[in-house]
Amino acid sequence: MLAGTIGERNLWSYGALERAAQYISTQLTTSGYTARRQTFDLAKLPLSNVEAVLEGTTRAAEIVIIGAHYDTVAGCPGANDNASGVAAVLELAQRFSGQSQPRTIRFVAFVNEEPPFFQTAHMGSAVYANAARSRGDRVAGMLSLESLGYYSEEKGSQRYPAAIAGLYPDVGNFIGFVSNLASVRLLLRARRAFRRRTSFPLQSAAVPAAIPGVGWSDHWAFWQAGYPAMMVTDTAPFRYPWYHTADDTPDKLDYDRLAHVIDGLEAVIESIAVPNR
């Protein structure tokens, strides 16, 4: 829907951006949630993060955030980047609907992740994370779902930032978990839970945030606010040939493998939602 029907969605395609936000709200409502918007103005236009909340039981003040950005760069329909991440958030929200979990789980679709707003105060996730910090929210962990749908069995299909080149496989058939050093406990817990649920290939790294690519999504905003956060990704530009182009279309994605990743992420959320599991 986001890539195939709505297409490019950003401040310069504002009608499409708003249709995307409404679509996400409708899907969350259909799954049994009250969809809420966090709205802020930019260029005299209202922009929205869209949120659904599964209230926790015994540890409701502790919060787990599962997020993905729904905007695209100009000229790009954004199937992998990042309709795939949004689809995963919506599917996971549906799976957890009506459940009881100790910690509160927030499912959030962020606006304005892409340039020129990337890593600025106008990034939707920065607005969200800063508001959470101002309220004193206790975020136990944040997962940024960023480009989840492209996989290859070809040798040489996977590349890396220079600082870690040669340390990981050169075949792009895995999902990646990436965190900064301060979030290593979150990453290790997520990795254990994922591997207990599925045998899908997983590579993980807790590395300095200064390495190029490590902070390239909404988890970066939560690091800036002092929260533990990690990115779940197929590595986007380090693997995907159509990154930020008009050819980032739904036919490029591997939906079977994406489904396996979502299964593993369900287990990750189940683990993080229970303190000390």
Q: Where are each of the predicted segments found?
A:
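Active-site-adjacent substrate-binding region
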Residues: G141, L148-R277
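A non-catalytic alpha/beta surface segment that caps or lines the substrate-entry region
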Residues: M1-R59, Q203-A205
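Acidic/histidine-rich, surface-exposed loop or edge segments in extracytoplasmic proteins
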Residues: M1-N10, A68, A109-F110, Y168-N173, ...
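Acidic/histidine-rich catalytic neighborhood of metal-dependent amide-processing enzymes
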Residues: V73-L188, I211-V214
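Sec-exported extracytoplasmic/periplasmic mature domains
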Residues: A3-L11, S25, T29-T34, A93-Q101, ...
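Extracytoplasmic/secreted proteins, especially bacterial periplasmic and envelope-associated proteins
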Residues: M1, G15, R19-A35, S84, ...
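A mature extracytoplasmic/lumenal domain signature
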Residues: T39-D41, G56, A68-T72, A109-V111, ...
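Structural recognition of the beta-strand scaffold that forms the well-ordered cores
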Residues: R37, E51, I63-G67, R106-A109, ...
